[in-house]
Amino acid sequence: MTRRFFYVLLLLLPLSLWAQPEDYTWDVAGSNSAESMPCGGGDIGMNVWTEDGDILMYVCRSGSFDENNTLLKAGRIRLHVGEPYVYNTASENTPSEKHTYSQTLHLSDGTMTLSCPTHSVTLWVDVWKPVIHVEVNATKAVHAQIFYESWRDYDHPVGRQEAQQCSYKWTAPKDLVTHADTIIRRDDFIEFYHQNPPATVFDYTVMQQGLLSEASHLYNPLKDLISGGRLRGMTSKALRHHHFQLTLANVQGSREEWRKTLDATERNVRLKADRLVTRQWWAAFWQRSWIRCDGEAAELSRNYTLFRYMLGCNAHSAWPTKFNGGLFTFDPRYVDSQSDFSPDYRRWGGGTHTAQNQRLVYWPLLVSGDYDLLQPQFDFYLRLLSTAETRSRVYWGHGGACFTEQIENFGLPNPAEYGSKRPDGFDPGLEYNAWLEYEWDTVLEFCQMILLSKTYGGMDISKYLPLVRSCLQFFDEHYRYLALQRGRKNLDEDGHLVIYPGSACETYKMAYNPSSTLAALRTVTETYMHEVDTIGMIGFLQRIPPIPHRIVDGKEMIAPAMAWERINNEESPQLYPVFPWRLYGLGRDNLEIARNTYLYDPDVVRFRSSKGWKQDNIWAACLGLTEEAARLTAEKLKSGPYRFPAFWGPGFDWSPDHNWGGTGMIGLQSMLLQEVDGEIIILPAWPKSWNVSFKLHASGGRTVEVEYRDGEVKKKIIQ
């Protein structure tokens, strides 16, 4: 038995070593938070850098929303150990000192180490408990001082521009403030928390949108929310080994309940065991999938891996990873010199979840096999299902869930985007907004992700099925309802729904049968029927209109819609039937039509870019346009403008731009692996000169492992 186990271990060892990512190291100290390195786990992120000889850490925990729906940082931690760190900013002139300082992110186990000749500091976050550990190890006894620093020690007025960080945005009242935190210093710990007052932006939004009679039934994550933590480990003694612990808690309740939660977490800390299970989790995370390139593409796969690490830091959260910075925003003046605000600032809000952007953070997780990372985004919509159904019932008197594009974490449209100066009699269910009116189909992408999580990973999705059904029901009932507002019939002469007014993304407005919406309805319905219920959705499927085509300069292509009133943004929804809906593309009879759309549609060509949330690299890969896909994906995944390579942006949003990273991930994956009706296509858009080894996930619970080198497939394992 022992010998057999030994041989099995030897067989598994090469795969294990190949899967583990390389460390990422700096040997020159940074000088500000924009030159920070991320570290995290569970639902906590830290930006770590050195400044004036001290180690500084911004700490952010997912779900720490204030009364205005700003996503607050827990604060800043400063660690001073003995003598200041030796700086290497002049290392080019003094090569003998080049390695006196190092800061290393150990991706394989999620830890970070900062080292100088006299001591090292190791940082790690428990992936199962909201606890940060700071460990100092020195060659001789040293004093180590740790400080908690806050910028919220007074009521801070929030002006109109700074209010972009919260749900009020440009409609912020003149007296808007971020209320002060409570900070308590004791001999052996520091305790700090932000407690939301009784009235929050939730109450304002409910009143604004005519739902006061329903308020007690609506989900409210801001009510009585207390977020903060407790820092322990301070000592005046000089020691060779110091250990500091920062425990965080977010509780909707009283201060006593919040403290009980902190106490319980602290009692459950088992340092050695917690360190072991955290390292095991990260090791298993990297075993799930990988992409390793060398040569000219090595930078792309490295940055793919670094960004995937950042996503992994929010794996066990109650809240999705925000597209506009996730857990790793830094001082805003380094993103925009005109935004000299607090570290809590990020453009496009903290509790506002823009669906078109959020989806791009989550699509790549199916192919990477990170199904647990998908769950916070799925749960986000599930929690809001009742609120979305309430909107349909109160405003229009029919069923189904109406989710809007700029959606708050309590399920209603963002109050600024909803419109504060609305005409009398305007439909209260609609956003009075030229970009967002009638755009409510993005939730269907998350519905498809839910269904594919079962297809790919065997996830139990039973609790999410009412959400999927209700989202489809909304389109069936609402567009028949609108048709009857216009005339006697609720379907067209072919028995199809009339999706009007519709919206093809934010771009083609007042659209008639937009192709992006029709592709979404058809794909989600067919996937639902295949995975769950073959019979019950047949009638609805038959009512979905066909995707419209048009002829431009003699070439047939997908139309954005049958008709539209105006173009309002710069998206290309006519390619959504290619991605995310995979109805057109390689291995299908309609490939030429899709390629014509990509290559010759004048708007698609005009809007093409690799910036931010732009998806052209993905479409090029899905259409087998290898040179184009490689060029655009290389532009996506090349190192960003900040010191840490996977801090992209700000793009159209903020830094680090997570939908920039998400589109890069999807594009790289799609160049390596695609499927058509369950048939796997290997290297569909991969340059012959790029060497790669990868393991990715496919439908049916399959994994695909390939080594491609010097223009040949050296290994292919599908299991």
Predicted features by range, described:
Residues R4-L15:
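Sec-dependent N-terminal signal peptides
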Residues V8, A141-V142, G457-S462:
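Secondary-structure transition into beta-strands, especially the periplasmic turns and strand N-termini
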Residues Q20-S420, L518, T534-V605, P645, ...:
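Aromatic-residue-lined binding/catalytic grooves and analogous aromatic/hydrophobic interfacial grooves
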Residues L300-A315, V443-L452, P466-F475:
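Extended, hydrophobic/aromatic-rich amphipathic alpha-helical segments that build helical scaffolds
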Residues F323-T352, A401-L465, D476-G539, K714:
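The feature captures the catalytic groove of carbohydrate-active enzymes
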Residues H353-L366, E439-L451, S516-E526, E570-R582, ...:
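Well-ordered alpha-helical segments within folded domains of soluble proteins
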Residues D370, D494-G495, L625-E628:
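Loop/turn elements at helix/coil->beta-strand transitions in domains of secreted/extracellular proteins
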Residues Q448-L482, G539-E565, P573, Y584-V704, ...:
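Non-catalytic carbohydrate-binding regions of carbohydrate-active enzymes
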